[in-house]
């Protein structure tokens, strides 16, 4: 006998959290029916898109078998009598009217966060077999937030001239292109021959270089080792127009990441680093130079790769001073190969964790994206928390303009053919933060950040972004 699952909601926008819930519903049932609240449904003004457009958005999903309009939820459930009613995990500790109805006929109310291991957005794009332009992909996002191509171009131009102070871990990225030779006859080892080596400034250094490339006056504060990689990085930063206040730490080498690549694929990455905390004396030097320069900047960016630059006391002193000067402050704490913690940066204006980093921060691998966003917000007291989802784009959950409700939305990934995904988060962080510092609302800022990420992943290695590059991607 066919098992029916029912999911209901507003669905002003179908984001990654919904897609994962739909997929889970199909895994536990034979048929998925989605109920969309009618325009007349009393939701205190939270319905922002006409029911016809919302139906079209949900119906196009590959996991949805049927869509119904809900004028009265209780009547709809009594008429349909679904075997399972599925809701997001964030509803599990709330009062749910469905519980009173479903017991009447013996159904089940279940909660799920959706599995983040698979890229549902990428899967949908593959099913559709099409590749939309950037403008085609963001048309709905533009409409929902009253944006336009001209307004986004205006934001991109307005970030020029900002004064940006970046603090964080300096990294040198090496790319060694190799020619595959074959498999060793002695053991199952891939044998390659090096052909060409390229070196780029990475880590927080490229965040500062991106800021300079986008037209800002960029200052970078960090540490490096007393070695050739450190000297090469400092010289590169100077050539890229970054004012570098980088202190020598004789207790560590300059952090270096070497990627061995063949035929456009990375075979192996070797990290050379020390991640112990820098000593108190050096930490005080960094803190003091930042505090001395705060008043002459518009934006502070904390770029934490967990290699020892930041102490909790340093973060507290700088953020407290930033608030006194009414500065925009943004932070990212990466957990790709290291173990970062974005909750180390409370009370800033913007944080940009990946989904993995957000889940690690609140120790929750089960809740949906809305639930995770709420938990991170409560842990950090930060309102603007775009969560980056890789090939699924960016998800943002924040208070609406009246502060009475919440708005969820998603910008899809804007580059389907990435060359090198490393550095995408850095590009997103700096472009989003600079947009906010220029006065843009968070929706415009996240769109600009997404365009910047699309530009970055389209090339190998870290090269600074430019405003012309962002505008060209927006037109593509």
Give the residues covered by each predicted segment.
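Conserved phosphate-binding/catalytic region of the ribokinase-like
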Residues: 277, 296, 313-328, 335-347, ...
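Positively charged, low-complexity intrinsically disordered leader regions
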Residues: 1, 138-181, 474
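Conserved N-terminal subdomain of the carbohydrate kinase-like
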Residues: 172-301, 463-476
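Nucleotidyltransferase catalytic core that binds NTPs
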Residues: 1-144
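Short internal beta-strands
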Residues: 31-38, 88-89, 219-224, 329-333, ...
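Short, glycine-rich nucleotide/cofactor-binding loops
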Residues: 6-18, 167, 192-201, 308-309
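Histidine-anchored nucleotide/phosphate-binding helix
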Residues: 15-31, 200-214, 319
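Active-site metal-binding loops of divalent metal-dependent hydrolases
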Residues: 10-11, 90, 169-170, 305, ...
């Amino acid at each position: 006998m066919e098992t029916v699952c029912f999911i209901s909601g507003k669905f002003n926008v179908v984001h990654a959290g919904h897609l994962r819930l739909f997929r889970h519903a199909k895994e536990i049932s034979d048929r998925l029916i989605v109920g969309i609240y009618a325009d007349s449904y009393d939701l205190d003004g939270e319905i922002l898109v006409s029911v016809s457009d919302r139906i079209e958005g949900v119906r196009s999903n590959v996991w949805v078998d049927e869509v119904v309009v809900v004028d009265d939820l209780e009547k709809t459930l009594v008429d349909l009598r679904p075997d399972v009613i599925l809701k997001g995990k964030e509803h599990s500790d709330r009062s749910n009217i469905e519980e009173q109805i479903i017991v009447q006929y013996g159904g089940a109310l279940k909660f799920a966060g959706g599995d983040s291991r698979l890229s549902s957005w990428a899967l949908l794009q593959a099913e559709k077999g099409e590749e939309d332009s950037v403008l085609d992909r963001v048309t709905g996002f533009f409409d929902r937030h009253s944006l336009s191509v001209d307004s986004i171009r205006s934001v991109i131009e307005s970030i020029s001239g900002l004064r940006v102070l970046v603090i964080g871990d300096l990294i040198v990225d090496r790319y060694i292109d190799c020619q595959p030779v074959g498999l060793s006859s002695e053991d199952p080892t891939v044998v390659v021959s090096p052909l060409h080596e390229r070196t780029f400034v990475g880590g927080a250094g490229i965040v500062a270089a991106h800021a300079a490339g986008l037209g800002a006056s960029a200052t970078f504060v960090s540490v490096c080792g007393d070695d050739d990689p450190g000297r090469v990085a400092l010289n590169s930063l100077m050539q890229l127009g970054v004012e570098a206040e980088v202190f020598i730490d004789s207790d560590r080498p300059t952090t270096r990441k070497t990627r061995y690549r063949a035929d456009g694929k990375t075979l192996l990455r070797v990290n050379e680093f020390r991640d112990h905390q820098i000593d108190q004396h050096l930490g005080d030097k960094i803190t003091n130079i930042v505090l001395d320069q705060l008043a002459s900047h518009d934006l502070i960016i904390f770029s934490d790769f967990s290699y020892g630059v930041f102490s909790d006391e340093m973060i507290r002193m700088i953020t407290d001073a930033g608030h006194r000067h009414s500065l925009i402050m943004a932070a990212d704490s990466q957990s790709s190969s290291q173990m970062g913690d974005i909750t180390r940066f409370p009370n800033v204006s913007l944080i940009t964790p990946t989904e993995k980093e957000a889940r690690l921060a609140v120790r929750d691998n089960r809740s949906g994206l809305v639930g995770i966003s709420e938990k991170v917000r409560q842990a950090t007291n930060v309102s603007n928390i775009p969560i980056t989802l890789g090939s699924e784009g960016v998800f943002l959950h924040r208070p609406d303009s009246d502060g009475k409700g919440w708005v969820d939305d998603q910008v899809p990934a804007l580059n389907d053919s990435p060359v090198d995904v490393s550095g995408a988060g850095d590009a997103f962080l700096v472009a989003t933060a600079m947009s906010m510092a220029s006065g843009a609302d968070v929706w415009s800022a996240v769109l600009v950040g997404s365009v910047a990420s699309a530009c970055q992943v389209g090339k190998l290695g870290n090269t600074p972004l430019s405003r012309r590059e962002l505008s060209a991607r927006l037109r593509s």
